[in-house]
Amino acid sequence: MARDMFKRRRYCRFSAEGIKQVDYKDVDLLKDFINENGKIIPARITGTKAKYQRQLTTAVKRARFLALLPYTDKH
């Protein structure tokens, strides 16, 4: 119960900023949802709603395919 007191409420960044569609060309936005290894951060950590998480996943995969984002980190 004490642990619940210190948790911050997560919010959906896309809903708060009024973004309707996640664009694969917006690389700066997509980088915020990818960890240092190149993996997509899950919605339970970022607080993104399911609708936008699906769009985000598709956008990241498209950006990777077009070489806008790396598949993995630089080893």
Swiss-Prot record:
The keyword rRNA-binding applies. It holds the Pfam family Ribosomal_S18. GO terms for molecular function: small ribosomal subunit rRNA binding; structural constituent of ribosome. Part of the 30S ribosomal subunit. Forms a tight heterodimer with protein bS6. PANTHER family: 30S RIBOSOMAL PROTEIN S18, SMALL RIBOSOMAL SUBUNIT PROTEIN BS18M. Binds as a heterodimer with protein bS6 to the central domain of the 16S rRNA, where it helps stabilize the platform of the 30S subunit. This is Small ribosomal subunit protein bS18.
